[in-house]
Amino acid sequence: MRRLVLLALVVGLGAAAARAGTPPTVVIDPGHDLRANLATEPIGPGSSVRKILDGGGTRGVVTGIPEADLNLAVALRLRRLLRRAGVRVVMTRTTTSGTSMGNIARAEIANRAHAALFLRIHADGSADPSADGTHTLYPALQKGWTDDIYARSRRAARIVQAALVRALGFPDRGLQEHTDFTGFNWSNVPVILVELGFMTNPTEDRLLATDRYRQRAAQGLCRGTLRYLGRSPTACG
């Protein structure tokens, strides 16, 4: 009996060690793509309410840079930093070259990867050119859709928002819950969406077009992500 107990203990410790040695997976989702996708999809499992897959994003008011290009540029920088920190990274796209896949498909990539965090990268737009700042969105509590990821998503949003604002220095617009984001409602893993800044604000548009600020954004996202995962952010630079 004692031998069986010891064997079970050894096997249990070995399994725990294997789990501890497995790097966490982060799915990075650079928002949008080359072309919008005006087909529709249900906003959540079993819902009769539908939204378009992808409206196409915004564009730099001064630079003319499409949001999809900015999102991807920051995402690729973030991938390098997270990999350096020992995190397994899955990207929803690595080029800006096609019609957007939509938000259910993006969430399913994160679900299949069993992501520790599904990090969606966007930039904002407004009819008011004075609108500025950084904010982070996360799923509202909805029974049957997000109740299993709500608390972790909210915690991730708080940590990543703080790190991103500190890195970019843009005004802090805080956190926002959303009930109608398809990519949130179909996600089975913690999920947040960051809005780096406003591409319709001349100052923020110019800054986000530079390598310096794109690197700052990636570093802020890296630090926030690693802190959420309980890891040291030193590899983020």
Residues covered by each model-derived region:
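Catalytic-site microenvironment of enzymes
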Residues: 1-237
